């Protein structure tokens, strides 16, 4: 349609925010944008992870490749990842991926000299760049020496066993390998729109109202102790199971409660691996999403645009 516009102005409202957790509302947009944001957070926000391991000495019970795999999965603080270069694009080292602009070097050297088992952990990795280090999950410094807060275990050594290695961490994205994903989990749900027919509800006895409330597997509804009316106490607890709707129909009251998802309102839950803070993860994803949308909007090659962003690219062009 000539003159049609799909322009919207999405809004975000923060509900809960911690270093590794965020919960927020995304409103005034559609599901294609919400899902695009979710996927960018999981697979396209860059982080730094160990990508190359040179084993010098390994007399532990684990093979070299086992240790290299474990090292790759250790989350590293990645606040500066957005400003780093991808090793494949770095002209300072001709793509070798071992310079200060595209990589960070780590060293590890541990040897067990007692009869006590020695735990080699992520805290034994020494970084050449103090801004890129293994994530410290210790919250309370007073318990930092406890067995639960010694870092991620890489291998256990017995007397005489030794592990010495050099590792190179590089910038990457989760689309290439899961070790670069900054997100432990990212989910969103449609915000439910729950409508109670008060006239029909008034025809029910208190016992029937209680039966209706208890038919929901999650505590979505409750009864007002003063008015004795059924009220919505936690709409977000609804899991779209339709049990309360089926109960109303079984009671001969179809239409007593109507529940539908709001197609322009979504509730996001984001958990970070610790590589970047949850708030920064969301902001970085939005920046990357804007870059992608600009590329789609300016692209003359519709096939290329659709490869880049699928259904959202077609939607933006009005297709």
From Swiss-Prot:
PROSITE patterns: RNA_POL_D_30KD (PS00446). Component of the RNA polymerase II complex consisting of at least 12 subunits. Interacts with SHH1, CLSY1, NRPB11 and NRPD1. Interacts with IYO. DNA-dependent RNA polymerase catalyzes the transcription of DNA into RNA using the four ribonucleoside triphosphates as substrates. Component of RNA polymerase II which synthesizes mRNA precursors and many functional non-coding RNAs. Pol II is the central component of the basal RNA polymerase II transcription machinery. It is composed of mobile elements that move relative to each other. NRPB3 is part of the core element with the central large cleft and the clamp element that moves to open and close the cleft. Belongs to the archaeal Rpo3/eukaryotic RPB3 RNA polymerase subunit family. Disulfide bonds: none annotated. It is found in: Nucleus. GO terms for cellular component: cytoplasm; nucleolus; nucleus; RNA polymerase II, core complex; RNA polymerase IV complex; RNA polymerase V complex. One of its GO terms (biological process) is stomatal complex patterning. SUPFAM superfamilies: Insert subdomain of RNA polymerase alpha subunit (SSF56553), RBP11-like subunits of RNA polymerase (SSF55257). It comes from the Eukaryota. The lineage of its organism: Eukaryota, Viridiplantae, Streptophyta, Embryophyta, Tracheophyta. SMART domains: RPOLD. The modification N-acetylmethionine is found at residue 1. InterPro entries: DNA-dir_RNA_pol_30-40kDasu_CS, DNA-dir_RNA_pol_insert, DNA-dir_RNA_pol_RpoA/D/Rpb3, RBP11-like, RNAP_Rpo3/Rpb3/RPAC1, RNApol_insert_sf, Rpo3/RPB3_RNA_Pol_subunit. Keywords: Acetylation, DNA-directed RNA polymerase, Nucleus, Transcription. This is DNA-directed RNA polymerases II, IV and V subunit 3. GO terms for molecular function: DNA binding; DNA-directed RNA polymerase activity; protein dimerization activity.
């Amino acid at each position: 349609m000539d003159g049609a516009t799909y322009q919207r102005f999405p809004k975000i409202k923060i509900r809960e925010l911690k270093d590794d957790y965020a919960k927020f509302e995304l409103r005034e947009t559609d599901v294609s944008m919400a899902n695009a944001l979710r996927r960018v957070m999981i697979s396209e926000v860059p982080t730094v992870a160990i990508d190359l391991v040179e084993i010098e000495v390994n007399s532990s019970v684990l093979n070299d490749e086992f240790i290299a795999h474990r090292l790759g999965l250790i989350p590293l603080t990645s606040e500066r990842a957005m400003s780093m270069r991808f090793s494949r694009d770095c002209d300072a080292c001709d793509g070798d991926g071992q310079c200060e602009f595209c990589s960070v070097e780590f060293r590890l050297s541990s040897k067990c000299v007692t009869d006590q088992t020695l735990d080699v952990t992520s805290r034994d990795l020494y970084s050449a760049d103090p801004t890129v280090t293994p994530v410290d999950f210790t919250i309370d410094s007073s318990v930092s020496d406890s067995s639960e807060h010694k870092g991620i275990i890489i291998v256990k050594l017995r007397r005489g066993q030794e592990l010495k290695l050099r590792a190179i961490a590089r910038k990457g994205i989760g689309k290439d390998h899961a070790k670069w994903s900054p997100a432990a989990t990212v989910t969103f749900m449609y915000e439910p729109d729950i409508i109670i027919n008060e006239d029909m509800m008034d025809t029910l006895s208190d016992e029937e109202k209680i039966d209706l409330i208890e038919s929901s597997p999650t505590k979505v509804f409750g009864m007002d102790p003063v008015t004795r009316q059924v009220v919505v106490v936690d709409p977000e607890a609804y899991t779209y199971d339709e049990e309360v709707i089926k109960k109303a129909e079984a009671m001969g009251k179809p239409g007593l409660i109507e529940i539908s998802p709001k197609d322009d309102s979504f509730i996001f839950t984001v958990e970070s691996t610790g590589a970047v803070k949850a708030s920064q993860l969301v902001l970085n994803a939005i920046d990357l999403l804007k870059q992608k949308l600009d590329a789609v909007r300016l692209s003359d090659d519709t096939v290329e645009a659709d490869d880049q962003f699928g259904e959202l690219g077609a939607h933006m062009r009005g297709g």
